[in-house]
Every structure is written in C-alpha cells, then in structure tokens.
C-alpha cells in the first residue's frame, strides 16, 4: 500500500474552511484515482506538536541517541518520541497534501512547529561538510500545498504575498522532494458567494494535479 498523508492547519470545521474543503476534494480524488493509497490524517490543531528544546538534540537537527534519551525525564522522553514519530510519518508518505489558510503572508504557527519537527538529520536531511542534503530523494514523492486567501493575488505579486508557499516549497526541496504542486484558493472574499466561487475555481484544477502525481509505482 502507498501512503497518502493529509495535513490540515485550520481550527475551523471543514465545511467552514475553504482550504480544508478543497483539500478534502483533492484527497478524495486521489483515493478514487489510485486505489493503492491508504489515507492518514494529521490535524495540526488537534495533534500534539512538541516545541523543540535544546536538551532533545545531540547536535544541530540531530535527535539524541537511545542511551542519551534514557537520561532525560520521562516527560521529555515522550516529547522526543513524538517528534520522531511525526518525522517518520512524513517521510514514509508517498504523497502529502497540506491544506492551510494564508495568515500574515505566511501560514498558522502550528505548521512552522511541524516543519521544525520533520527536519531531522539522519531522517530527512544529512550534512555533507557544512551543506545540507536531502534524504527524501530515495524514491519519487509528491507534496501538494493547498492554500486559501481572501484576496485575488496577481502573478506579479506572488513573491511578496505567497511567502508561506515558497517557504514550504523550499523546505521540501531541501529534504529532496522534487515534485511540488500548489493549489491556490484565491479570492475567498467576504461573502458566501465569493468563497464558493473561489472553491469551485480551485476544484477545477484538481484533476490535472491528480493525473500528474509522482510516486513509486508497484
């Protein structure tokens, strides 16, 4: 079985969230198109995402080994285990869908905390000399970033407004993931009509994304 990981970053119920509504439609179409996928869901507003503390690391981005870990208090050991679990869940996925609103030209804080957890030496990156190198180029993977925003963002303003999108894309490349798609739900506006129009416009792009997912075929 292939693994599809669906990460949501919005405290709103799905039927009130444009990003989650479109994200769900994308996930459903992936599952309909490729029956070899098993779905795992991670709600970053409900899951425990540990805050990284210096005592959890042997060196930069490198978690403690078993012997050093056992010297920590039980609560801190649990935090380290959760960080490793989140990282392993991500790297085991063949396709990852992240659904989030744009906040303050970026995204809600839980997504940054999650990214900090999954950037780990020996799991998703390594260092060759002083330069980082991604480890997730061992097989084809795809990440799709679904982002909602109230305004229609013109292409020439994309570098300024879509800082969150570009950050996530850069982090995926850092980890070695080459296939990255965005699905933008722009112009959700202030009225139900504007929101529905933006959702439907984004949904019309789903089929093209699904047809071109890259993952290791059986």
Protein language model features and the residues they cover:
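Short, well-ordered coil/turn elements that cap or connect secondary structure elements
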Residues: 34-36, 138, 177
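A short, hydrophobic secondary-structure junction motif
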Residues: 26-30, 139-147, 172
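Glycine-rich phosphate/pyrophosphate-binding loop and the adjoining helix
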Residues: 28-31, 154-218
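Cofactor-binding loop segments of dinucleotide-utilizing enzymes, especially the Rossmann-like FAD-
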Residues: 9, 148, 185
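Short coil-to-beta-strand
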Residues: 1-4, 97, 141-143, 176-181
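Helix-loop-strand module that forms the ligand-binding subsite of alpha/beta enzymes
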Residues: 76-166
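Short histidine/acidic/glycine/proline-rich micro-motifs that form metal-
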Residues: 11-14, 152, 189-190
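N-terminal beta1-alpha1-beta2 submodule of the flavodoxin-like/Rossmannoid cofactor-binding fold
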Residues: 1-100, 105-109, 113, 204-218
């Amino acid at each position: 079985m292939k693994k599809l990981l669906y990460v949501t970053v919005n405290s709103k119920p799905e039927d009130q969230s444009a990003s989650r509504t479109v994200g769900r439609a994308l996930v459903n179409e992936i599952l309909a198109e490729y029956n070899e996928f098993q779905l795992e869901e991670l709600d970053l507003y409900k899951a425990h995402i540990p805050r990284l503390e210096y005592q959890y690391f042997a060196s930069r981005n490198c978690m403690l080994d078993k012997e050093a870990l056992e010297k920590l208090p039980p609560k801190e050991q649990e935090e380290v285990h959760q960080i490793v679990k989140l990282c392993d869940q991500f790297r085991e996925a063949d396709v990852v869908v992240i659904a989030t609103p744009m906040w303050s030209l970026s995204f809600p804080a839980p997504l940054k905390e999650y990214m900090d957890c999954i950037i780990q030496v020996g799991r998703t990156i390594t260092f060759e000399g002083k330069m980082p190198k991604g480890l997730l180029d061992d097989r084809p993977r795809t990440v799709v970033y679904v982002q909602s925003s109230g305004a229609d963002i013109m292409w020439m303003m994309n570098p300024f407004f879509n800082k969150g999108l570009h950050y996530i894309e850069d982090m995926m490349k850092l980890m070695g993931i080459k296939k990255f798609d965005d699905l933008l739900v722009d112009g959700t506006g202030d009225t139900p009509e504007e929101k529905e129009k933006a959702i439907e416009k984004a949904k019309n792009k789903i089929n093209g994304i699904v047809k071109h997912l890259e993952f290791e075929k059986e």
